Every structure is written in structure tokens, then in C-alpha cells.
């Protein structure tokens, strides 16, 4: 059950960082898929322009695995559209993330909308879409 999945404080912080980067990029109309790698001592944000979702995921896999054991966590973020139960489309930032040493990764989301030319994030009681297998080598 999605409601039973638990996200660590570290992954929650990484999700918030990824969403903040999505908001900045979308507000400047320069949104491209990107990868956040948590590597000591700080982190790295890599833009991942790609022709398809498959190409994006393949490139992210390469970069995550190339980082080896130094990669503590990662987040792959992109702009997409989800649908409410009614079928109504709603724009959302999608973030797949995982932390080394944890059995589960997650695909999470944050809805947004444009109001009077400003991007506003819409709060939702559950941000988790599904469990995901971590992409570590």
C-alpha cells in the first residue's frame, strides 16, 4: 500500500531540493530533466536533455553507476502530466529517488499550476506514486 511506504528524512530533503530546482527551471522556462547526485562532500546537479524518457533513464543509470559507492543518493526529476481520478490532466513534477543501503526507492510527485502567470505548488496529502527499485550498480 502506498500510504504505508516510508521515506527517510534524507530522501525527503532530496525530494524538496529536486522540487525547488524544478520550480526554478520551470519559472525560467528552461525545464529539462535533471539528475541530482548526493556525493561527498556536497552534491551535483546534472542536466539531462534527452529525446525520450528511455534515453533520459539510460543516461541517468550511466551517471549513477559511474559514481560508484561514492553516490549516497540520487534523484531523477522531470516535468510531466498526471491524471486525477476524474481523468482531468494536471501538471506535475515527477522525482524518482533512492538512497544507498535502502531496499526501496520511490517515485514521488508534486502538482503545480500557473495562476496569474506565477507557478504555484499544490499540496497533496501523499506525494508517493509508487515504489521503485534503486538504480545503484
Residue ranges and their predicted role:
Residues 73-137:
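Low-complexity intrinsically disordered segments
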Residues 54-84:
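A charged amphipathic helix-loop-strand protein-protein interaction module that recurs
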Amino acid at each position: 500500500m502506498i500510504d504505508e511506504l516510508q521515506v527517510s528524512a534524507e530522501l525527503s530533503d532530496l525530494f524538496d531540493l529536486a522540487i525547488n530546482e524544478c520550480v526554478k527551471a520551470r519559472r525560467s522556462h528552461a525545464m529539462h530533466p535533471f539528475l541530482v547526485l548526493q556525493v561527498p562532500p556536497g552534491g551535483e546537479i546534472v542536466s539531462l536533455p534527452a529525446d525520450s524518457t528511455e534515453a533520459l533513464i539510460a543516461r541517468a543509470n550511466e551517471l549513477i553507476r559511474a559514481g560508484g559507492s561514492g553516490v549516497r543518493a540520487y534523484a531523477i526529476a522531470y516535468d510531466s502530466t498526471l491524471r486525477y481520478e476524474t481523468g482531468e490532466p494536471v501538471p506535475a513534477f515527477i522525482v524518482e529517488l533512492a538512497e544507498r543501503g535502502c531496499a526501496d526507492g520511490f517515485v514521488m510527485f508534486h502538482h503545480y499550476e500557473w495562476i496569474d502567470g506565477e507557478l504555484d505548488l499544490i499540496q497533496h496529502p501523499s506525494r508517493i506514486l509508487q515504489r521503485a527499485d534503486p538504480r545503484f550498480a
